[in-house]
Amino acid sequence: MGKSAATRPSAAAAPEAPAPVETAATETASTEYEPLLPRIPILDLSPQVDEGHWAASAFSGEVVPFRATAFREGHDRIGVDLLLLNPSGTQTEHHMRAIAPGTDRWEVEVQLEQEGLWRYRVQAYADEYATWRHNAEVKVPAAIDVELMLTIAHDLLAKAASDKRRSTAERRHLSEAARVVADAERGDDERFQAAVDDRIKRILTERPVVALPSLSATRAVLVERTRAGVGSWYEFFPRSEGAKRLPDGAWQSGTFRTAAKRLPEVAAMGFDVVYLPPIHPIGRTFRKGPNNTLEAGENDPGSPWAIGGPDGGHDAIHPDLGTEKDFVFFLGKAKQAGLEIALDLALQASPDHPWVTQHQEWFTTLPDGTIAYAENPPKKYQDIYPINFDNDYDGLRTEVLRIVRYWMSLGVRIFRVDNPHTKPLHFWEWLIHTVNETDPDVVFLAEAFTRPALLHTLAKAGFQQSYTYFTWRNTKEELEEFLTGLAEDTPDFLWPNLFVNTPDILTEYLQFGGPAAFKIRAAIAATGAPTWGVYSGFELYENVARPGAEEYIDNEKYEYRPRDYARAAALGRSLAPYLTMLNRARSEHPALRQLRNLHVHGSEDDAVLVYSKFLAGEFTRSGKPDAVLVIANVDPHSVRETMVHLDVTAFGIEPGAQFEVRDLVTGQRWTWGADNYVRLDAFTEPVHILTVKPLEAAR
C-alpha cells in the first residue's frame, strides 16, 4: 500500500466543491456549535505527515517515538496512553510519559516490527488517583481535610478493585488497602500509608483510575521491510567488470557473468545492495564519447542513460552484457552472496529508442519538427530525449508499469529512479502505490538533487529512499545541521541514502582532501544514517576530476573502467578494509541502524564534529543498551587537539559517571567522562568511532 492510500479521504468526506458562501454563512444559525476539542485537549500528534494526509513512514525494527501534547484546565493530574493497532488488528496500550517540563508534551517509544499499515490514537484522561495523591501528600501531613482525603482514597481504591481487567492479586491488594483506609479504628497515618504504598502506586500507575477519557484523531504509520530503510549500497557498471582491451585497441565489454565474479568481494566488504546503472541497449545517434565529448568512436560504449536502440528499449538487455538468462544468473549469484540488486529506472530515451517511432507523442516536438533533447543548463544531453507525460498520460503510465513489473518478474525488488523530480509527481504516486499494493517489498530510491519542497513531496508520495545534499555538506556546522535535520525534522517521511560519491559527483572535498577525506566522508555516511552508499573506485581513492567540473576524468558513464582492486590492496592503497570495518560496525551495533536517535554533542574546535547514537536495551536482541560515539576531524589537512563536551545522558550514562570507550578504528580503550581531550590526526586516523559502556559493564 502506498503512503497516500493510508489516509486519503473518501469521496463523501471530500466533496468536489465547497458550499456557496451565502449557504455557509446561514447554515448553522439554529444549530448548536460542536467544539473541535475533546474534553481533555490532545494536539500535535507525532508521527504524522501533513495532518494525516499521508501515512507516516517507519521500517521494520525502527524505534518510533510517539508524541502528543495533552493538558487540562486547573491543576488536576492527567494520564496519556498510546492506543496502537497493528496490521493484524490487535490493539496494544502504551503509557506515555511527560517530557520537557512545562510543555505538556508526552512520549512513548515503540519498536515497530510487523510490516503493513499501523494506526494509532492517543487517549488522555483524568488520573483520579494521581490527583488524589498529589493533594493528599500535601494535606494529610499538614492535618488538613484528613478524613475527607481518606474517604476519597477509599472510594478510589474500591473502584479500582472492582475493575475485572485487573489480575486477581491486584484486586486483592486494592481491596485490602481500601479496607485499611476505611478502618477508623486505625491511625490516620496507617490509613494514609495503605493508600500510598509502593505496591498500590505501581498498580494504579500501570492501570490508572480513569475519568473523562478523551481521544485524538486517528493517524497511520506504514511500516515497510527493513531494507527499505537500512542498507549499505555499492554501485558498479557491469560492463566494466571483466572488460578487456583487445590487441587491436578495441574493448571487449564485461558481461553479467564476469560481473558476477565481483559480487563476493562486494559482499565481503559488508555491503547489502549492488546498484547497477541502466543495463539496456544504448543509442548510436549523438552518442557521447569519452569525457562527454560530442564525437564517439566506433568502439566507444556510450552512456547507459541514453536508453534504446535497434535491440530494444527499457525492457531489453544490452547484448554486450548478455541475455535475460545471464541476468537471472547474475541475480542468483547476488542472492547467494547475500546481496540484493537495485536496477536503474531512467524514464528517458535515446533518439534510437523504439518509442521515438512508435510513440512520438511521448516526447516534446518543437515548432521546427524536431524532438527536444535533455538540457540542464549549461549541460546539454543531445543523446537523450526527455519524456512528455501530458500527451498520452494513460498510455505512458501503463507502459512504465509493464516495464517495472517485467523486471520484478525476473527478481528485481529495488529500483533507483533517475531524476524523478523532472517527471510529474502524481505519476510517481500512482506508480509506487500500484506496485506496492501487490508487492509491498519493492523499494524505490529517488535520485533527486532538487529543492526541499520537491524532494519532500516525492518522499511523501511514496519513494522509500531519497538522495540528499550530503555530498556538499562538509563543515562541522553544515553537518550538524544536516544530520540533525535528518533525525528530527523529516524522519516521518524521508529516509536518506547517503552516497559519498556517484559517477556524476566528485566533490572538491574528495578531489583535494587526500585519503583522509575519503575516510571522513565514509565514516560520517556510514554512521550518520541507516542507509549509505559508495560508487566503485571510491575504495581506490579515485580523485581526479575533469577540469572545471565536479565529475571524474575519463568518466565511466562514457567508457569502460576496469579496476585492479587486488593490486591496490596488495600495495596498501585500498580503502576496502576501512569500508569493511564501517559495515561491520553497522552490523554489530543496532544503534547505527536507526534514524531518529542521532544526538549532536559539543567540541571546542570548529572542525571537530561530535555525535552519538543510542538504543536502549529493551530494543536490542541482546537486551543490552547499545551506544556509539563518533568524533570526526572534518578538516582533512590538519591535526586537531580539543576538548569535547558530552551530554552523557543521551547515550545512557548517568550524569557524573565515568565510562569506557573503545575505538572501533584502532582498538584503543579509554576511560572517559563528560569532558574529554581528543587528538585527531587527519594523516593517520581522522575519526574516532567509539563504543560506550558503563565501567561495570566493560569489566
Residues covered by each model-derived region:
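Substrate-binding cleft/loops of secretory-pathway carbohydrate-active enzymes
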Residues: 350-361, 428, 436-437, 449-477, ...
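Carbohydrate-interacting/catalytic domains
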Residues: 1-243, 247-272, 281, 334, ...
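Active-site neighborhood of glycoside hydrolase catalytic domains
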Residues: 365, 388-455
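Short, acidic/polar
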Residues: 254-265, 392-407, 517-522
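Aromatic- and acidic-residue-enriched carbohydrate-binding clefts of CAZyme catalytic domains
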Residues: 229-254, 282-330, 357-394, 553-562
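Catalytic-core region of carbohydrate-active enzymes that cleave or remodel glycosidic bonds
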Residues: 434-447, 452, 474-548, 617-620
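Hydrophobic faces of well-ordered beta-strands that scaffold small-molecule active sites
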Residues: 232-234, 274-276, 341-343, 415, ...
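Short, solvent-exposed turn/loop segments enriched in Gly/Ser/Thr/Pro and often Arg
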Residues: 275-284, 345-354, 418-424, 447-451, ...
